[in-house]
């Protein structure tokens, strides 16, 4: 599995605006191949928010980013205080012994 972390700053006092976009974010993510889960994260005081998403593969995450990144940019264009920061990580899962 693979994960993507995108952090963006919109400034304080925008929590309700971001909260209003969460359902749209969710629908967009769920429509992408290889989607597993997304968390929308944020700190109201600093005005920093982001998404942490999990994908079946790095290729799925990168393909989804081609769709999601422009949508995010457009949805937040009047709010963004600088470009979003993006990272990708391999997901490391512990081996489980179910016995």
Show where each model-derived region lies.
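Short S/T/G/P-rich N-terminal loop/turn motif that feeds into the first structured element of a domain
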Residues: 1-49, 56-70, 77-99
């Amino acid at each position: 599995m693979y994960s993507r972390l995108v952090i963006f700053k919109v400034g304080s006092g925008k929590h309700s605006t971001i909260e209003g976009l969460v359902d749209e974010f969710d629908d967009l993510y769920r429509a992408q191949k290889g989607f597993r889960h997304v968390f929308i994260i944020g700190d109201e005081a600093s005005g920093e928010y982001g998404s942490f998403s999990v994908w079946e593969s790095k290729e799925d995450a990168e393909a989804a980013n081609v769709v999601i990144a422009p949508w995010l940019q457009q949805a937040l264009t009047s709010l963004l205080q600088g470009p979003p920061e993006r990272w990708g990580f391999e997901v490391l899962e512990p081996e489980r012994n179910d016995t």
